[in-house]
């Protein structure tokens, strides 16, 4: 059974990654424009903006405007996470779970729980998979059911797909996941000429983001806002919800499916841990 579950986790992660990597991945970049964005975010972090810290971590992680540096990426994800930045909590948590010099399973799980409790669905999905694996921590199917159900109810596309896979596979259909399977069973079939909610979200997710537009908007807004790290409440930009901003997504708005950067490396990290 364990081998079957591990295989399903790996396949589900890789299938989810496939259509999204090229569309959403922040590619390495050494142009003058990319370096200018990197410099701008470096300045904003010194002023104390947690959103800038999270974005700077992403730039280091991808090698955008600078040399790729996972240690510095981890540093900035952790620093932003300290101030309650949900996306950074997720990313730092995932990096804590990977086999590396800074692996710390307890800290990784704790960060994912903090982020998930703030209704950040990728963290809830990750927790559900981790509790199912019986690898990083002992298997807990009650926790699996709770976290996967939470992610499903937050309209996380990958949680919905994974739940359906678990429900339809003969090897996992009898797992004691009553709340999750009840949600899957309650899904109504759609007309042949209409799109399901999953298909509609897939269309949203595969659209390539305009990173320059995101960066320009966030930099302009942060330059006009007060630093937020003194009170640790995430974005303090007046008149905007945290989830309106690319580097500060908390999934507070139903239309905001998830941070565009989460679909590839986070799932890859989890997939590597179930082999």
Model-based region annotation:
Residues 17-47, 51, 206, 214, ...:
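N-terminal leader/linker segments that initiate helical-solenoid repeat arrays
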Residues 30-38, 67-76, 101-111, 138-147:
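Structural signature of tandem alpha-helical TPR/SEL1-like repeats
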Residues 55-62, 89-98, 126-133, 162-169:
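Hydrophobic face of amphipathic alpha-helices that form TPR/SEL1-like repeat modules
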Residues 33, 41, 46-50, 62-64, ...:
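Short helix-capping/linker turns of helical repeat alpha-solenoids
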Residues 26-27, 58, 62, 71-118:
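Alpha-helical adaptor scaffolds
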Residues 1-9:
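Bacterial N-terminal signal peptides that target proteins for export
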Residues 115, 138-158, 164-189:
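TPR/TPR-like (Sel1-like) alpha-helical repeat modules
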Residues 9-19:
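Bacterial N-terminal signal peptides
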């Amino acid at each position: 059974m364990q081998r079957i579950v591990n295989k399903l986790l790996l396949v589900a992660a890789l299938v989810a990654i496939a259509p999204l990597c090229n569309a959403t991945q922040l590619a390495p970049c050494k142009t003058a424009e990319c370096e200018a964005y990197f410099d701008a975010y470096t300045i904003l972090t010194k002023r104390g903006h947690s959103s800038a810290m999270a974005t700077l971590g992403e730039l280091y992680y991808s090698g955008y405007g600078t040399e790729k540096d996972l240690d510095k990426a981890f540093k900035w994800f952790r620093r932003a996470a300290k101030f309650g930045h949900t996306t950074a909590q997720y990313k730092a948590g995932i990096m804590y779970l990977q086999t590396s010099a800074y692996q710390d399973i307890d800290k990784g799980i704790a960060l994912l729980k903090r982020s998930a409790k703030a209704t950040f669905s990728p963290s809830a999905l990750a927790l559900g998979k981790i509790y199912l694996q019986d690898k990083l921590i002992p298997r807990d199917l009650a926790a699996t059911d709770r976290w996967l159900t939470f992610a499903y109810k937050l309209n996380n596309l990958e949680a919905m797909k994974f739940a359906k896979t678990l429900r339809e596979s003969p090897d996992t259909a009898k797992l004691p996941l009553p709340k999750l399977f009840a949600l899957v069973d309650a899904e109504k079939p759609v007309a042949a000429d209409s799109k399901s909610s999953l298909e509609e979200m897939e269309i949203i997710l595969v659209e390539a983001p305009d990173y320059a537009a995101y960066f320009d908007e966030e930099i302009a807004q942060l330059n006009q806002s007060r630093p937020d790290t003194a009170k640790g409440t995430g974005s303090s930009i007046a008149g905007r919800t945290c989830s309106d901003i690319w580097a500060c997504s908390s999934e507070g708005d139903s239309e905001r499916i998830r941070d565009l950067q989460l679909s590839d490396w986070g799932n890859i990290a989890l997939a590597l841990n179930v082999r």
